[in-house]
Curated annotation (Swiss-Prot):
Enzyme class, spelled out: hydrolase
An annotated GO BP: one-carbon metabolic process
Annotated residues for binding of Zn(2+): C80, H83, C152
UniProt family annotation: Belongs to the GTP cyclohydrolase I family.
Lineage: Bacteria, Bacillati, Bacillota, Bacilli, Lactobacillales
Pathway(s) this gene product operates in, as recorded in its UniProt entry: Cofactor biosynthesis; 7,8-dihydroneopterin triphosphate biosynthesis; 7,8-dihydroneopterin triphosphate from GTP: step 1/1
Gene name in the database record: folE
GO molecular function, one term: GTP cyclohydrolase I activity
GO cellular component: cytoplasm
Catalysed reactions, as listed in the record: GTP + H2O = 7,8-dihydroneopterin 3'-triphosphate + formate + H(+)
NCBIfam families (UniProt xref): folE, PRK09347.1-2, PRK09347.1-3
Subunit structure: Toroid-shaped homodecamer, composed of two pentamers of five dimers.
Record protein name field: GTP cyclohydrolase 1
EC code: 3.5.4.16
Length: 189
């Protein structure tokens, strides 16, 4: 099935090259259709997948509801579902462990990859990371901040280079406790 999809993408890329006035047999673009098909397989690796399974929970001593676990500046690359252009940036995630459950730290960047390697918008990417962590951990709260640059803003349309978009997700104590939310945001500076 993947091979068939790649062949279709390659055909479509050759057609696009023709439609924009290029020659798909020209030396510089001769292998472009294969490269584009391979690129989509990589950057959209989790397209259509809905269940994140690549994690392990660890038992730890019961913690207070204000003990924050935070991972900051996790890089990501994604594709805008509106224009199929890249958006990229950093994700910071914090959670308040409950019931003696913590997640392996390497699993948080894997979750970011799982959510970002599909067509999306930043608002949904932010929400999905937070909701999945809530489902897995059932913590006292989750906070997610995503800062990203969007090529659909920078290279087309309004063409505003280096502009950044910030989105946040809060649940549990992060949503109800303004001081805790402030502490999370202060740690991001």
């Amino acid at each position: 099935m993947i091979e068939q999809a790649n062949q279709q993408i390659e055909k479509d890329v050759r057609d696009i090259l023709k439609q924009v006035g290029d020659d798909p047999e020209r030396a510089g673009v001769l292998e472009t259709p294969q490269r584009v098909a391979k690129m989509y397989g990589e950057v959209l690796a989790y397209q259509g997948e809905t269940i994140f399974k690549d994690y392990k929970l660890f038992e730890t001593e019961e913690t207070d509801d204000d003990q924050m676990v935070m991972m900051q500046d996790i890089p990501f690359y994604s594709m805008c579902e509106h224009h199929m252009l890249p958006f990229f940036g950093q994700v910071s995630v914090a959670y308040l462990p409950a019931n003696g459950q913590i997640i392996g730290l390497s699993k948080i960047p894997r979750l970011v990859d799982f959510v970002s390697k599909r067509l999306s918008v930043q608002e949904n990417l932010t929400r999905d990371i937070g909701q999945i962590l809530n489902q897995i951990l059932k913590p006292y709260g989750v906070a997610v901040q995503v800062t990203a640059r969007h090529m659909c803003v920078e290279m087309r349309g309004i063409k505003k280079a280096n502009s950044q978009t910030h989105t946040t997700f809060y649940s549990g104590n992060f949503k109800t406790d303004r001081q805790l939310r402030s502490e999370f945001l202060q740690l991001l500076k």
